[in-house]
């Protein structure tokens, strides 16, 4: 790989642009020496390991170790830029406490729930797993086994896991941690369009005239995309940026329309904007008449709490929270008319002139607008509604599926889209938007997987929050966790999380690269390979699927999650997991292992070892004797081809810097549902929302409803949790990078200085954050990047020494079953 004069000039320009945008680049990116003869480095491409942006990086390897990473100049997503986390990618795999051997709780040489962790062989680890899983399956059946997976699984890891549980163990009790971050987005897409994932793409950033951030701090959480917004705003003076949040953060630095609103009132604000559009005759009537229908959703749907909770008992429509009925445009207009400027301003605390400025961005026919959101919408007890309601604004004005007009749901994990959603690792889903409750979908999955009819259960399994409750209640007893840190990430962990992990009736397995809070609560820890220690694939927020090769070996005895899943499947014969009447439908499966049935089925094992690129290692292919990643991917791709989820052939992704599906005849799709851009839209129709049988999108009439818990005299503050630029999720990787750790070593409680003064508190003092569920200690911060309004505190959750989720409430959106981490009531006590 050599550097031409043109490439050198281009790379220098990239470095200069990064400096202006406030994005740090490694020295190697500014002085891009890539001649392997000089450096003795082997450079290869990969997507970044962190967020759902999907930045491309180049990875340098020497002596079987990653020694450097750079932003990939050829990557369309980031065009050579890195954020500060991407800068230090080369260090995430080399923490001093990296796990390299299986660890089992032992006492006197035997497994003991109350024993100490001791190193064991993989054979001993799987022996105990096998014993525990078979015991539970025999005593209680498939509903007592489960798995909690991840939006950080590679595509084939998630696919193999879903297959093992839903087909092998016949249990739908598998859910990803994407339930915590993207489930409301999924339900929003499915309810409005009948298909998941955005219709637009990142190209919209260069075409939009206005950007509206609904509960998204892109400057810190999606900094590379923020540089594209910044570039558009600074180079096109008429471009406007509106930032809406419950507290001030770094994204407000660019805001032309800064809006601080009271928690939960974003629902009312969106109804006001819809009312404004209608009142001012700005509805795109031709688009609305041809391409939309109207429905009214049921209300009073509860908060996803335990059935005996008073709020749940009072909910009239908790049994079917997603129900709706058809209405007319006039009905919808009357519905939103209740949300006038005076009412919404009083409710939200937002001045009326600000509401009108915001509404005009959507109403003005000459303004192309992108709406962008992340956890502010999704982690919301009405998160599915919030997603539906922002689509209302784009559909009423016809500002959708064209360059610059895009309601865009941003993702937080590198493959929350590609693995959790597209593969269907949720407890109710199958690949390509299929669901377990649909008989035709189950039949199709069983056909592709060569299963006896009736293998896949017809009821959704336990979702993430319910898994914790069922572990606590002793109804879920054999449980495997991969690539997540739910003991730190889940709400109300002391009441609903930890008790289940330490329940004597349960056996908990955690696969991870580091001894996380979750791993330390388990009974068996399995050491996992990370990132480029295995061949992988991720799918990012713009439907872009990206591949990488294995570049280095995992340390010690660490093994990939894919190897763990498939190797463990060898421990079970069909007679151990399937009833006799099911086996009778496929008598040729008698005596076979789940590995034989699921992975050595003539499809997954179709591609021989000789097809593996000889320049790269592939530990899994070597272990199993065939190109397992290719086989899994091609079998999985069968679900979506011809159904609007088309993926390119496997080998194409190793050549490309990612492709955006649907990929038809080798061509990717940038804008879905629009004629001329989407191959599934018929000529002459203009637009087709073909996920719905009638080809039309749904505009929903949905109200404002209050949160599950609000401040009162005893607990006078709102608590909001979230992330910071330097750390990713629970910090299990970033806190092991010295530079990132030093930049932000510990979480703090961000508080308004006047609130602190009124309580006699000073910056830096130790305080206790207390809720009805628990408490945690931290230091008070009244300055810095995050500035809450009075009556609200913000606490990041990356710090394993300060478990803020001891305090949070495990209320969910009843439709998406996603937790609301943004709203509960607390008090602050000086220690």
Swiss-Prot record:
Q: Name one Pfam family in it.
A: Molybdop_Fe4S4
What EC number(s) does this enzyme carry?
A: 1.9.6.1
Q: Which UniProt keywords apply?
A: 4Fe-4S, Electron transport, Iron, Iron-sulfur, Metal-binding, Molybdenum, Nitrate assimilation, Oxidoreductase, Periplasm, Signal, Transport
| Described purpose of this protein according to its UniProt entry | Catalytic subunit of the periplasmic nitrate reductase complex NapAB. Receives electrons from NapB and catalyzes the reduction of nitrate to nitrite.
**Can you quote the record's cofactor note?**
Binds 1 [4Fe-4S] cluster.
Matching CDD domains:
MopB_CT_Nitrate-R-NapA-like, MopB_Nitrate-R-NapA-like
Residues in 4Fe-4S Mo/W bis-MGD-type domain copies: 41-97
Q: Where are the transmembrane segments?
A: none
Gene3D superfamilies from the entry? 2.40.40.20, 3.30.200.210, 3.40.50.740, Dimethylsulfoxide Reductase, domain 2
What does the PTM comment state?
Predicted to be exported by the Tat system. The position of the signal peptide cleavage has not been experimentally proven.
Enzyme class, UniProt record, top EC level:
oxidoreductase
The reaction(s) annotated as catalysed by this protein in its Swiss-Prot or TrEMBL entry are:
2 Fe(II)-[cytochrome] + nitrate + 2 H(+) = 2 Fe(III)-[cytochrome] + nitrite + H2O
Cite the record's note on assembly: Component of the periplasmic nitrate reductase NapAB complex composed of NapA and NapB.
Segment forming the signal sequence: 1-29
Q: What is its subcellular localisation?
A: Periplasm
Supply the InterPro entries for this chain. Asp_de-COase-like_dom_sf, CT_Nitrate-R-NapA-like, MoPterin_dinucl-bd_dom, Mopterin_OxRdtase, Mopterin_OxRdtase_4Fe-4S_dom, MopterinOxRdtase_cofactor_BS, Periplasm_NO3_reductase_lsu, Prok_molybdopt-oxidoreductase
The name of this protein is Periplasmic nitrate reductase
Q: Which GO terms describe its cellular component?
A: membrane; nitrate reductase complex; periplasmic space
Give the similarity note: Belongs to the prokaryotic molybdopterin-containing oxidoreductase family. NasA/NapA/NarB subfamily.
Gene Ontology MF, one: 4 iron, 4 sulfur cluster binding
For biological process, the GO terms are: cellular respiration; Mo-molybdopterin cofactor biosynthetic process; nitrate assimilation
Q: Which cofactor does it need?
A: [4Fe-4S] cluster; Mo-bis(molybdopterin guanine dinucleotide)
NCBIfam families membership: NAPA (TIGR01706), PRK13532.1 (NF010055), TAT_signal_seq (TIGR01409)
Record's keyword annotation contains Disulfide bond: no
**Residues reported to bind Mo-bis(molybdopterin guanine dinucleotide):** 85, 152, 177, 181, 214-221, 245-249, 264-266, 375, 379, 485, 511-512, 534, 561, 721-730, 805, 822
